[in-house]
Amino acid sequence: MNKPICSTGLRWLWLAVVVVILDISSKQWVMAHFALYESVPLIPFFNLTYAQNFGAAFSFLADKSGWQRWFFAGIAIGISVVLMVMMYRSTAKQRLINCAYALIIGGALGNLYDRLVHGAVNDFLDFYINNWHFPTFNLADVAISIGAVLVIFEGFLSPAEKNAVNKNE
């Protein structure tokens, strides 16, 4: 029951690799050029602000004693494995869903790298309106969010619409 990898959704894992490279590179640049919590305004609603998150999205569980590092690392590994199995079971022509899975995997692995190497996820994208700041995030978070939106979008497509999206292969 072995299938050539190029005929499966795993063919799209290159996108996950690109996300990991861009995410880790951008975080390394920020860590090399910013002190922790240093902020540089770029435009009236956006700063580059170096922050660390010991929890998950919106600093969920960030105030715990450290066990959450391994908990979230396990979740990232588990989700990545499940999505890779789903990609293997799909065809390479199912571009939308495979790209979505690859974005989520790339984001999960980018943040996993931070958790394992730095003990926390490094964030630096800071959007705000007046004094209200959206939680600081990074490129891995952007990839995960886009991937999740694409999964939801794909779920609303009819089979005919899915065929039209995936047709040009």
From Swiss-Prot:
Compartments where found:
Cell inner membrane
**Pathway this chain belongs to:** Protein modification; lipoprotein biosynthesis (signal peptide cleavage)
The membrane spanning regions, by residue number, are: 4-24, 29-49, 70-90, 101-121, 137-157
Taken from the UniProt entry, a GO cellular component term is:
plasma membrane
Gene behind this protein? lspA
| Name recorded for this polypeptide | Lipoprotein signal peptidase
Q: Per the record's keyword annotation, is Hydrolase included, yes or no?
A: yes
Q: What does this protein do?
A: This protein specifically catalyzes the removal of signal peptides from prolipoproteins.
A Pfam family of this chain: Peptidase_A8
Alphabetized PROSITE patterns for the sequence:
SPASE_II
A single GO molecular-function term is:
aspartic-type endopeptidase activity
**What Enzyme Commission number(s) apply to this enzyme?**
3.4.23.36
Catalytic activity line of the entry = Release of signal peptides from bacterial membrane prolipoproteins. Hydrolyzes -Xaa-Yaa-Zaa-|-(S,diacylglyceryl)Cys-, in which Xaa is hydrophobic (preferably Leu), and Yaa (Ala or Ser) and Zaa (Gly or Ala) have small, neutral side chains
